[in-house]
Amino acid sequence: MGRVTANGIELEYEVFGDEADPTLLLIMGLGAQMTTWPVEFCRELAGRGHQVIRFDNRDIGLSSHMDHLGEADSMAALGAAMAGEAVDAAYTLADMADDSVGLLDALGHDAAHIVGASMGGMIAQRLVINHPERALSLTSIFSTPRFIPADPEVVAVFNWPDPGTLEGRIQAGVDGARITSGGGFPFDEDLVRRYVAANIDRSWHPEGQARQMVAIVADGDRTEELRSVDLPTLVLHGTHDPLVVPQGGQETADAIVGAELVWIDGMGHELPPGAWPTILDGISGLVAEAERAGAPA
């Protein structure tokens, strides 16, 4: 684990693998700490010949919390967006993309292969739009170029009231993970419970999640901007994602010229171990392709 100043804030990060290998920057999603990229997943990715960087986004985990910016009403922001009204955010996805670039700067990387999941995929999209020179490839996992309404009962997972007790918070995390899973892979409740408990013990900061949600909504529709992206791109999406619906994956792939779209049958909004071979093969193949294309003749 390490900590650096990037874009004027503090970011907590961890690196796996050999610094001589191609660098992958993993960007995680809404309210999710870097530990949502499991250690075993990162080690397997590093074992395939990559240097892997995971980190806590601003306002979550052990990175800088932005409480001085005030509380956010994420449901009001969603309502405004659905009504076509402007949304005022404490910070933006562009700011979060700048955080990622600042982390690369702090660690001495001119560019990296960018991998983002969910909101992390949205940040990754914003990064390759705003900072194309810093990206060698883009992998977008269960993400979307714009806000596409999902089932309100599924979205409500992110606005459940705080149970107020440790066990209540753990159970809510388990229930939320079950609701957003796709049903095509085994749901290991004991494993999920241990993971949720460890994350709560590491950091509990729902106020940051609310501000991140408003940042998502405020960024609007990136579709037209993505048409200018000229990078090797892979889009991975579960066929049964109830939160970021499959349409989001299709629209991402359609917006980026030459993007490859891989559907993972039965996967929801999750990274189940049973899907890792497909995900790891996809990322590794894309990185190898990009490295070959960028090698001197």
Task: Please name every model-derived segment.
Residues 9-83:
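Conserved HGGG/HGGXW glycine-rich cap/lid loop of the alpha/beta-hydrolase fold
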Residues 90, 94-112:
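Conserved acidic catalytic loop of the alpha/beta-hydrolase fold
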Residues 110-149:
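Conserved hydrolase catalytic core segment
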Residues 144-198:
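Helix-rich cap/lid subdomain of alpha/beta-hydrolase
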Residues 198-222:
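Hydrophobic, aromatic-rich cap/lid helix
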Residues 229, 235-237:
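Short beta-strand/loop motif that positions the catalytic acidic residue
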Residues 240-244:
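Acidic catalytic loop of the alpha/beta-hydrolase fold
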Residues 259-297:
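Catalytic active-site module of serine/aspartate enzymes centered on a nucleophile-bearing elbow/loop
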